[in-house]
């Protein structure tokens, strides 16, 4: 079937696509083919963004099935015919879960992750799996694929670890994407690729079928999109109770009928926002010119928040924040338990234990920092200290919000511009430079980033909002109001056309 020349897929929203389906202007097959053409032109060729690891060979067949269903009885669900790209850390049956590593190139899970299953039920087309920091952490480099390039500057990294998802959404390889965050793995690449991304409150989204999120309440899948409305629509589908992930029991009672009910362009009017100016980014250099370029954008953003009706408390101070963040550590047996919890879902585990992974001849090909993280020796004393610091920081954070009567806290989404790829691969490198890791401790609070414009170097920057536990809806409201007031999103020039 010929493609629809009248429909422009670049920056198309879920509403745009559904309106085109309804009018007969577009079919799901045509849309999927448009995205496949863009992936071929801009990910594999041209600028060679290198954000995609695996494309679903049955994507067009699934599109045909959805077109037939639509013709027979209307949309299958809220994401009918919407192409989604998923970070290659979450299982999607029919595609390998590689973790970006040669070690797992041939691992095909025998079932969907909880979120992938929800996406299918909602009518989405899971188009592809995206690149990531190898083994699920760090900047987006891996032994299986190399490095992913930032579509705004091909010499720079996309960030990580959900860099492939972020670049794919920004470059219009799909309508929306799914990332995973433990430290800043959704927010940092979303910021550096000029899109919006959210790490929901722990317990809203299941960790079932996602590598590296267990046993600690550490990681969560989250939505990534070019607009806050699309993000909210995707989040509606991702959330829910999963009997296989006990932590989702905590989310019961905190899930609204739809997060889109919170979308209000006047949502910032009367909202009290505290501005956190203290540097909390990893390896940040507050006296550098690069840091100042981000600060300029952030200062403008604070003014824009105020102009949109927010009451600004500037600055606010979170006592002991750096001291407590410095005590963050991995848990004892974290790799061992993560391995068991994840591969225990499948009858096709490629390795029996982490030690077997380490003993594999291919382990030497893994990015060095990913090797180090995987081999990390447990330290029970440091882990205990970390848990105490986590609890103390959570109490301090909530007290600051209560003392100032705040609805949210705002800080720089990332404190530096995207780093050069060469700096992230070969020593001396700066991994995750400027990434704020406050929410690594505050796992039950939601956090969202929104584009805030561009630096003097024409690179994307963003603002990050953090709210109270399970106040995800209001955080979406504030983000949407800021987005509508500013419209900072701009697609990258390197992937224009088609």
Where are the predicted features?
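Glycine-rich, small-residue loops and helix-cap segments
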Residues: 24, 81, 121, 127, ...
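Short glycine/serine-rich loop segments
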Residues: 107-241, 442-464
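Short helix-loop capping/hinge segments that flank enzyme active sites or metal/cofactor-binding pockets
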Residues: 80-99, 264-283, 332-398, 449-459
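Acyltransferase
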Residues: 32, 36, 64, 258-261, ...
């Amino acid at each position: 079937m010929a493609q629809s020349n009248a429909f422009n897929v670049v920056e198309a929203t879920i509403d745009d696509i559904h309106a085109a389906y309804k009018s007969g202007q577009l079919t799901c097959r045509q849309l999927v083919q448009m995205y496949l053409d863009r992936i071929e032109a801009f990910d594999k060729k041209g600028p060679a963004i290198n954000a995609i690891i695996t494309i679903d060979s049955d994507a067009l067949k699934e599109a045909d099935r959805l077109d037939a269903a639509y013709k027979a009885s209307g949309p299958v669900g809220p994401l009918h015919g919407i192409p989604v790209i998923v970070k290659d850390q979450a299982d999607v049956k029919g595609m390998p879960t590689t973790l970006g590593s040669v070690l797992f190139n041939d691992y095909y899970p025998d079932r969907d992750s909880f979120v992938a299953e929800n996406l299918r039920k909602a009518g989405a087309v899971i188009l592809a799996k995206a690149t990531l920091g190898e083994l699920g952490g760090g900047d987006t480099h891996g032994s299986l694929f190399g490095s992913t390039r930032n579509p705004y500057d091909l010499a720079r990294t996309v960030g990580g670890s959900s860099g492939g998802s972020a670049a794919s959404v920004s470059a219009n390889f799909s309508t929306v994407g799914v990332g995973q965050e433990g430290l800043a793995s959704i927010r940092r690449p979303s910021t550096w690729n000029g899109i919006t991304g959210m790490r929901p409150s722990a317990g809203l989204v299941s960790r079932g079928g996602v590598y590296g999120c267990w046993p600690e309440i550490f990681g969560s899948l989250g939505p990534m999109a070019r607009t806050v409305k699309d993000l909210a629509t995707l989040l509606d589908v991702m959330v829910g109770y999963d009997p296989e992930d006990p932590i989702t029991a905590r989310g019961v009672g905190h899930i609204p009928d739809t997060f889109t009910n919170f979308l209000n362009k006047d949502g910032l009017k009367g909202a009290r926002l505290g501005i956190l100016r203290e540097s909390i980014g990893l390896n940040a250099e507050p006296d550098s010119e690069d840091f100042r370029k981000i600060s300029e954008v952030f200062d403008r953003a604070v003014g824009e928040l105020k102009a949109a009706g927010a009451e600004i408390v500037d600055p606010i101070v979170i006592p002991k924040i750096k001291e407590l963040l410095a005590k963050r550590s991995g848990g004892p047996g974290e790799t061992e338990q993560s391995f068991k919890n994840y591969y225990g879902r499948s009858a096709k585990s490629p390795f029996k234990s982490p030690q077997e992974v380490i003993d594999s001849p291919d382990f030497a090909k893994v990015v060095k920092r990913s090797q180090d993280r995987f081999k990390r020796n447990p330290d029970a004393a440091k882990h205990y200290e970390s848990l105490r610091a986590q609890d103390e920081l959570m109490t301090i954070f909530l007290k600051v919000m209560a003392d100032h009567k705040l609805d949210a806290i705002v800080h720089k989404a990332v404190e530096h511009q995207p780093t050069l790829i060469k700096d992230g691969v070969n020593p001396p490198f700066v991994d995750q430079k400027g990434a704020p890791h406050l929410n690594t401790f505050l796992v039950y609070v939601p956090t969202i980033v929104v584009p805030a414009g561009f630096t003097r170097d024409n690179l994307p920057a963003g603002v990050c909002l953090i709210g109270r536990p399970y106040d995800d809806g209001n955080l979406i409201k504030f983000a949407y109001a800021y987005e509508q007031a500013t419209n900072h999103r701009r697609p990258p020039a390197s992937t224009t056309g088609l």
